[in-house]
UniProtKB/Swiss-Prot annotation:
It is found in: Cytoplasm. The active site is at residue 118. This is UDP-N-acetylglucosamine 1-carboxyvinyltransferase. Gene3D superfamilies: Enolpyruvate transferase domain. Keywords: Cell cycle, Cell division, Cell shape, Cell wall biogenesis/degradation, Cytoplasm, Peptidoglycan synthesis, Pyruvate, Transferase. Phosphoenolpyruvate binds at residues 22-23. GO terms for molecular function: UDP-N-acetylglucosamine 1-carboxyvinyltransferase activity. Its main location: cytoplasm. InterPro entries: Enolpyruvate_Tfrase_dom, Enolpyruvate_Tfrase_sf, MurA_subfamily, RNA3'P_cycl/enolpyr_Trfase_a/b, UDP_GlcNAc_COvinyl_MurA. HAMAP family: MurA. Transmembrane segments: none annotated.
Amino acid sequence: MDSILVKGNGELRGQIPIAGAKNACLALMPATLLSDEPLTLTNAPRLSDIRTMTQLLQSLGAEVASLQGGQVLALSSHALTDHRADYDIVRKMRASILVLGPMLARDGHAVVSLPGGCAIGARPVDLHLKALEAMGAELDLRDGYIHAKAPAGGLKGARVVFPLVSVGATENALMAATLAKGTTVLENAAREPEIVDLARCLRRMGAQIEGEGSSIMTIQGVDRLGGATHPVVTDRIELGTYMLAPAICGGEVELLGGRIELVGAFCEKLDAAGISVEETERGLRVARRNGRVKAVDVMTEPFPGFPTDLQAQMMALLCTAEGTSVLEERIFENRFMHAPELIRMGARIEVHGGTATVTGVEKLRGAPVMATDLRASVSLILAGLAAEGETIVSRVYHLDRGYERVEEKLSACGAQIRRIPG
């Protein structure tokens, strides 16, 4: 397996282009299953998770062509040959569950393996299933698979109240509702930009949707959806990750394609820590103000709060902050697996349940460390950029699931980083 070698060497300066959002693209791709007309996605990220979703859709009989070096995806589901999403593919990625709603809505039946993905707590799919049951679906869980069948005449509009905010469940219910008979109201729906992006794409395909970006969405089902061309929204998690690079190392970096509204709560914490964020004509410019970074407290929340997917990277910044910071993880359990690796680099971190207390040190030290999940992997790279000596991050296949060309983007700004083939 590949690893990444990082040498801490001072300030970063330059520009980093931000890719299309992985989490948005992974929801947009299954939307092709709702229509027999082509769907074209532009600004697509080039990631292993996208390739996994491509394999899954192709296994169902969909056509997926990667164009312009992978930045354009041309999809068509005019002739599905199968409605069974097998474990061998689904186990690789949790977003695979998003084929369930579209297949059920369009063709009335689907068999989907229970999903896999990052090892971050339980992350159950029960909210997805309850939403589909509210629309009349008959579900049977056996042998590790979800066997789903729509009632005669198809899914029916319903009032769906999510007991917890769930991005994936909102996406599955939203797609299913576009072809359901009647009106569906989603209450306590997720508000993330990726939800808004999916709704806009579905509307381009002919769906009737109101309220995206709020906690209540209303969908009037239609008889059929058509084709569309849609640009994938900017990846706010990649944006936030690279904003932390000059924050940790010093210097000044412009993030091309970045927008404040995608990372508002995150920017507030950066400002409190002593990091300057300015809008430019092409994106965002980030620089550390004079002196050492200041400690801040962070609590992860659903959008528009501080994103859980930036918690690990923020911890890397706070490891060398002046003072003590408290990070409270309120979205996923077991999401501090990067903390022991940062401790190997000299960080002072104490974890008690869903809370981590970080007491800043003057300097981290390079060390061999192991990535445990996607966001943990990049947090260790960020820590390595500011550490004395060499840091070798192993198991970076996690990294390739969510970041494209990370070593190229950072080295273009002066970082000493390279991939070591495994």
